[in-house]
Amino acid sequence: MDFKDINEKIDTVEGFFQPLDQYIWDWILTLQNEENLFGHLVEFGVYKGKSLCKLAQHQKVGEHILGVDCSLSLEGMKTSVMNAVKKTSNISLAYVNLLDCMTEYLYTTRYTSEGGATTEFRNKARFLHIDAGHSGYNVYEDLKLADRYLSPNGILVMDDWTTRFYPDLVDAFYRYIITNPNSFKILMISECKMYACRPKEYSNYIWRMETKMIPFMKEHYNKPIKIFKTKNYVDSAKLVIMHESEYSKVDPQDNAIDVLV
């Protein structure tokens, strides 16, 4: 797969999606495909469909794309998103499902496509991205459905994790995992997003990130980056990935980090 080419296509879609995260998604989704991990691709908060198009680029036959966003009820929005998916990927639009509702609705309702078929998402999503309402209430409700949908070896991504304008977002996540300790465990923080998995898969994904993601990013991402790992506590080590210019602001004497690249 030509990652530069597919990301240039993504850049033609209106919206917000950091290039660094685009390549991180490419690595995760490619890894899952190489390891024959089957599962649906889900997004809460679609906007113009920019990141949904990235999911569509990695969809395998039989997998469904599900986008949930109340703004999809606006005139022309669904058509606009579908057109964006069509021009950036080769996916059959029959597998793209767009819903204009709150995630609370789906928590109590099995999703039925416009064709009448029922698609089961419970424990079936291998990749789930949350970028919807940023209030504590909205995020908590999104996490409830994400916990229901995410497969045992799936990846959860949350947007705007490092944006200080949305403190409720981080607070809601920690409130959720304190109440539901077997739900999610943080793997990595980028300059914008947080990446998590099921706790039982944590060591497997951390190992893959340390041994496989670094070579991938060196080969395909054309900007200098730093990846480092917190090491205060062995059982809660996290990876952090950022551009070298941002890393220069980190205190080099900080013994809480272990620079990997």
Task: Place the predicted regions along the sequence by residue.
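S-adenosylmethionine/decaboxylated-SAM
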Residues: D2-G15, Q22, D26-V261
